[in-house]
Swiss-Prot record:
Family, per entry: Belongs to the GatB/GatE family. GatB subfamily.
HAMAP family linked to this entry: GatB
PANTHER family assigned to the protein according to its UniProt record, in alphabetical order: GLUTAMYL-TRNA GLN AMIDOTRANSFERASE SUBUNIT B MITOCHONDRIAL AND PROKARYOTIC PET112-RELATED, GLUTAMYL-TRNA(GLN) AMIDOTRANSFERASE SUBUNIT B, MITOCHONDRIAL
PROSITE patterns (UniProt xref): GATB (PS01234)
Organism: Methanobrevibacter smithii (strain ATCC 35061 / DSM 861 / OCM 144 / PS)
EC number, as in UniProt: 6.3.5.-
Protein name: Aspartyl/glutamyl-tRNA(Asn/Gln) amidotransferase subunit B
Any GO MF annotation of the entry: glutaminyl-tRNA synthase (glutamine-hydrolyzing) activity
Subunit record text: Heterotrimer of A, B and C subunits.
Length: 450
């Protein structure tokens, strides 16, 4: 299987690409954020290209390791007929970035476009609020070899876009997915709007094309639609070539110059890309790559980790934030930014653990109460009665009592049933009201049984 992606992502700007209409099209009443320019009415001339859109397009190109086409860049008219395109053409730039790479997938080019309106065939209505919203199209080489690789690439791309702050995120992303298998023609699946959708569409299309090949049926070069509700693809039309779009330079828009100074300005404000941050975390803090990937899955979480790692052992902080904090965030369906958990609260909790003021189990219970809780970890511990760790002699006494009261579990453990040891640990924790250290308890149990 060979797969290439064409990913359309809306850029984060306050106004449209060639006019001053606002870009909050989702909240606005239908056909209210419009003007003669974004409707392409006769005589209406486009404004100069939105500077913020150019800056964001450059930033994303650089974060995806692209070379920048310095000098003059111009817009073309891409002609096609559809109800959401009143002019009959879409303005699309020549590539701004080219020859990039992400996650082992080569990026052929990145160029700017204007978004068309929103056509709803089932109702026969068109909302032009979206018309003219700035887009970039990210075009990859056909380097993706499986649906799983496509899913991984798109997840990593979304992470880069979130870090950049210059894109509107997965909810506005649309992907055209091109797939071919050996002996067949290329098939394009249009306007898939989620990572899950791209993965499911590729899985279905791969099976469909293999079945056609087995039956000796030709795989047509065509455009297909992915029906998310049924998780299938259906034919739309024969695939267009570039000549079908009749590209011509747009005479209403002067070329825009991309200078060295402009690129330097973008580099100064550009955040560190997540894949670069992963590499730096492993080198600077000595944590493993998998932990670094988890900690950089959100920009705010990565920033928090760095702040914590300056005050607490970085590896200890990594372990707790990777496992326990992410577990709690996932359970509550929260991003770190929305959790209300402060850096100083994480530091306080980890210091309590390091100073043996609380047990590991107590720490796990405390962190479960931390999201959107104005209490400090110490206050939570006091409220739940979790402060304090019992002394070794108290643990030894509890261990001996657990052994005496549970001879069957002891015999089962000696006969090879390792799970019985967990039962005995639980009994010791009960006797010490959860204030014994689980690791130390296991050690003392083994010494007394074996």
């Amino acid at each position: 299987m060979m797969c290439g992606l064409e990913i359309h992502v809306q850029l984060e700007t306050e106004s449209k690409l060639f006019c001053d209409c606002p870009t909050n099209y989702k909240e606005a009443p239908a056909n209210s954020n419009i003007c003669p320019v974004c409707l392409n009415q006769p005589g209406a001339k486009p404004y100069p290209t939105n500077e913020k859109a150019i800056e964001n397009a450059l930033m994303i190109s650089l974060m995806l390791n692209c070379k920048i086409d310095k000098g003059f860049t111009y817009f073309m008219r891409k002609h096609y007929d559809y109800p959401d395109l009143p002019s009959g053409y879409q303005r699309t730039s020549v590539p701004i970035g080219y020859e990039g790479e992400l996650n082992g997938v080569r990026i052929r080019e990145i160029h700017m476009e204007e978004d068309p309106g929103q056509y709803k065939p089932d109702r026969g209505t068109v909302d032009f609020n979206r018309s003219g919203i700035p887009l970039i199209e990210i075009v990859t080489e056909p380097d993706i070899k499986s649906p799983e690789e496509a899913r991984t690439f798109l997840k990593e791309l979304i992470r880069v876009l979130q870090y950049s702050g210059g894109a509107r995120g997965e909810g506005t992303m649309r992907a055209d997915v091109n797939i071919s298998i050996e002996g067949g023609n290329r098939v394009e699946m249009k306007n898939i709007n989620s990572i899950k959708g791209a993965y499911k569409a590729l899985k279905f299309e791969l099976v469909r094309q293999k079945n056609l090949m087995k039956r000796g049926v030709e795989i047509k070069q065509e455009t297909r639609a992915y029906l998310e509700s049924q998780m299938i693809t259906v034919g739309m039309r024969l695939k267009e070539d570039a000549d079908d779009y009749r590209f011509i330079p747009d005479p209403d828009l002067p070329p825009m110059e991309i200078s060295d100074a402009q690129i330097e300005n973008v580099l100064e404000i550009m955040p560190e890309a997540p894949h670069n941050k992963v590499r730096r975390f492993t080198e600077e803090y000595g944590i493993d790559a998998e932990s670094a990937k988890v900690l950089t899955s959100e920009l705010d979480l990565a920033i928090a980790y760095e702040a914590v790692a300056k005050q607490v052992d970085p590896k200890f902080a990594s372990m707790w934030m990777r496992d326990e904090l992410k577990r709690v965030l996932s359970y509550n369906k929260l991003d770190f930014a929305d959790s209300g958990i402060l850096v100083e609260d994480i530091v306080e909790l980890l210091e309590m653990l390091q100073n043996k003021e609380i047990t590991t189990k107590a720490g796990q219970r405390i962190i479960e109460h931390m999201p959107n809780n104005k209490q400090t970890p110490k206050a939570i511990a006091e409220e739940l009665g979790l402060l304090g760790v019992v002394k070794d002699d108290e643990v030894i006494a509890a261990v001996k009592q657990a052994i005496e009261e549970n001879p069957k579990a002891v015999n089962d453990y000696l006969e090879g049933q390792k799970s019985s040891l967990n039962f005995l640990v639980g009994q010791v924790m009960r006797l010490t009201r959860g204030k014994a250290d689980p690791g130390e308890t296991v050690k003392i149990l083994k010494e007394n049984i074996e």
